[in-house]
Amino acid sequence: MIVRSFKDIEGTDRHVKAASGTWESKRIVLAKEKVGFSLHETVLYAGTETSMWYANHIEAVLCVEGEAELTDDETGEKHWITPGTMYLLDGHERHTMRPKTDFRCVCVFNPPVTGREDHDENGVYPLLTEPEEV
């Protein structure tokens, strides 16, 4: 059993701040735990815009605080995301988030991330793996 608090994560390599300055994420469960998914708490900052494309991952997102406009960049369809709303990127959709307020969400990724990922110039997380233990 693993028990981990946000306090345990703050100030460690599990507390990731995007190079873009638009979000930060606490990586609660990672690939090295070998459970088949990763779990994060992410905050996207008010007034920012983040374009993403999880070409290598499926992501489920549950908003727990704040409000944001989610745009499907492939169709142009817009959705207003508020607390209690979930969206699932089951088709690797290119999308853009525009938070009106600080937007806090819980995210699940499959395959799991290692914790070292940040979006590249295309908004993609690279598919990183943990080295095999000898």
Swiss-Prot record:
CDD domains: cupin_EctC. InterPro entries: Ectoine_synth, RmlC-like_jellyroll, RmlC_Cupin_sf. It catalyses: (2S)-4-acetamido-2-aminobutanoate = L-ectoine + H2O. Its EC number is 4.2.1.108. The keyword Oxidoreductase does not apply. It holds the Pfam family Ectoine_synth. Pathway: Amine and polyamine biosynthesis; ectoine biosynthesis; L-ectoine from L-aspartate 4-semialdehyde: step 3/3. The keyword Transport does not apply. Coiled coil: none annotated. SUPFAM superfamilies: RmlC-like cupins (SSF51182). Signal peptide: none annotated. GO terms for biological process: ectoine biosynthetic process. One of its GO terms (molecular function) is ectoine synthase activity. Keywords: Lyase. Catalyzes the circularization of gamma-N-acetyl-alpha,gamma-diaminobutyric acid (ADABA) to ectoine (1,4,5,6-tetrahydro-2-methyl-4-pyrimidine carboxylic acid), which is an excellent osmoprotectant. Belongs to the ectoine synthase family. This is L-ectoine synthase. The gene is ectC.
